[in-house]
């Protein structure tokens, strides 16, 4: 009888542990959960920024590097790439439901999502909607994720929707600890972002 009770209790404990892993966020690593929660709340309120940096892209058919400019104003974004993959300049602008892509020497294209545009015109399967969160060092809130925290309770590694993101360097800007270098690995695309200048702002208050 005692053995049965022990086995039943062990099974319940195992199931409880598995249930925890299927929640929206599964936390691992050295960091403190409460400190991460506070850090996450602060960054979630950040709804505007300007980024200048470099981007490296490796895809099955081509690869290269270029410069990155990213202007975010709440739901509106303006992302510009110059020089990657020998394509010249590309500019992605839009908000939810209305997105435009301009490619130098090719023209202007429109779609309802940035993911559809980039895959159709450039062949890149890149979750831009998630990038709005990942670039701040946060998981996207609408799907499950596995988080590994560093000793400072910031993201060291993120796994979400088939992507792995590694955060190797942070810097403090205007009271926010923000990623300076991150590597994104997808099924057929690798992206490295090196951010030279972060200008974070809050517009929603």
Curated annotation (Swiss-Prot):
SUPFAM superfamilies per record: Prokaryotic lipoproteins and lipoprotein localization factors
Please state the span of the N-terminal signal peptide per the UniProt entry. 1-17
**Domain of life from the UniProt record:** Bacteria
Q: Name one GO cellular component term.
A: cell outer membrane
Q: Where is the lipid attached (N-palmitoyl cysteine)?
A: 18
Q: Disulfide pairs?
A: none
Matching InterPro entries, A to Z? LolA/LolB/LppX (IPR029046), OM_lipoprot_LolB (IPR004565)
| Bilayer topology term | Lipid-anchor
S-diacylglycerol cysteine lipidation: where? Answer: 18
Respond yes or no to whether keyword Transport is given for this record: yes
Query: Which UniProt keywords are present, listed alphabetically?
Result: Cell outer membrane, Chaperone, Lipoprotein, Membrane, Palmitate, Protein transport, Signal, Transport
Primary localisation category: membrane
Q: Where in the cell is it found?
A: Cell outer membrane
Gene3D superfamilies reported in the protein's UniProt record: Lipoprotein localisation LolA/LolB/LppX
**Oligomeric and partner information:** Monomer.
> Function of this protein?
Plays a critical role in the incorporation of lipoproteins in the outer membrane after they are released by the LolA protein.
Name of the protein in question: Outer-membrane lipoprotein LolB
Q: Which organism is it from?
A: Pseudomonas aeruginosa (strain ATCC 15692 / DSM 22644 / CIP 104116 / JCM 14847 / LMG 12228 / 1C / PRS 101 / PAO1)
Record gene name: lolB
